[in-house]
Amino acid sequence: NLSWANLGEANLRGANLSWANLSWANLGGANLGGCSNDLQQADMRGKDLDFTVIPLSCRSLKWKIDRRLAVQFLYHFCSHYCEDADIKTAQNNLLALANEFHRVEECGKIEPKV
């Protein structure tokens, strides 16, 4: 049970956090990367994931997330440029929600893709 733990700046590379209770844990700045790091099914609701390294592998799928984190992920997705028309359409359809990002004032509002 890692609830309320301050793991900010921690190097969790390779840690198996699958099914971990991380409720209200501070993960800001933590390194969650590494091919052996298993975050599947982790409860990420209420987490501060600003400045973390999140692996884009199957080991970080199926998280339980809250609206704040979902919006943060959408903001990052919508910030990228992709020439594919279907991706641009998806990004544009999600912009209103993505621009609710808690750091939009600092990072800037995302404009529609053309």
Located regions from the model:
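N-terminal capping/linker segments that flank leucine-rich repeat
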Residues: 48-114
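Tandem repeat scaffolds
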Residues: 1-75
